[in-house]
């Protein structure tokens, strides 16, 4: 609660804390409605620590998009390995490759950085939170995965040879036939396909961060 912020800050200072981090999961408070930004409360929180000479690391809230985004733009929801959109919980259920989601990320981050960039006590920004590989199977990710495979192997024959697809009659005739592993039992998937998908998912996250 805001009424104990100063008390907490004093105790942290007494304990020797010199740097704090904040706003990590606060997207719904920073943008309660699409395009409506409320940074007043964060201004006050930053001021509490600035007055005490403590440094601040601000965290982008991008790991936890607000509920209005999921309901208004369901295409930003991650698709799980069963081929269905994952149930909306409280965190981490967005597709990092979705362009609409990335646009919202750009907007909230630009607002945050533009507001606090001149505060000398704000010493840095944490990007997202505990980043994981983007294991999404939405149409955008399927398309990106196929392009990743094509860029790596160049020809479909090279894919078939590398994967040993002739063994299980799994030879592809074109890149459009390639799907990410979605079976409930991943042991039934071609391990080479699964490995390439995991590598793609990792690179997808790197691209998101950039």
Language-model-derived ranges and their functions:
Residues 86-210:
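Polysaccharide-binding and catalytic clefts of secreted carbohydrate-active enzymes
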Residues 6-86, 109-113, 210:
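Aromatic-lined substrate-binding rim segments of carbohydrate-active enzymes
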Residues 1-4:
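Boundary/entry segment of secreted carbohydrate-active catalytic domains
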């Amino acid at each position: 609660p805001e009424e104990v912020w100063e008390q907490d800050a004093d105790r942290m200072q007494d304990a020797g804390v010199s740097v704090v981090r904040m706003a990590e999961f606060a997207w719904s408070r920073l943008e309660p409605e699409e395009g409506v930004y409320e940074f007043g409360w964060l201004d006050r929180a930053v001021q509490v620590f600035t007055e005490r000479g403590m440094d601040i690391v601000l965290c982008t809230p991008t790991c936890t998009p607000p509920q209005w985004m999921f309901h208004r733009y369901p295409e930003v929801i991650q698709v799980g390995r069963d081929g269905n959109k994952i149930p909306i919980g409280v965190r981490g259920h967005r597709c990092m490759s979705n362009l609409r989601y990335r646009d919202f990320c750009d907007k909230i981050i630009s607002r945050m950085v533009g507001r606090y960039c001149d505060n000398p006590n704000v010493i840095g920004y944490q990007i997202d939170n505990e980043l994981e590989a983007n294991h999404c199977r939405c149409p955008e990710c399927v398309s990106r995965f196929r392009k990743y495979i094509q860029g790596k192997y160049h020809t479909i024959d090279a894919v078939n040879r590398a994967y040993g697809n002739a063994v299980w009659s799994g030879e592809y005739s074109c890149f459009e036939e390639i799907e990410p592993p979605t079976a409930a039992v991943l042991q039934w998937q071609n391990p080479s396909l699964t490995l390439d998908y995991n590598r793609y998912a990792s690179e997808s996250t790197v691209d998101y961060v950039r």
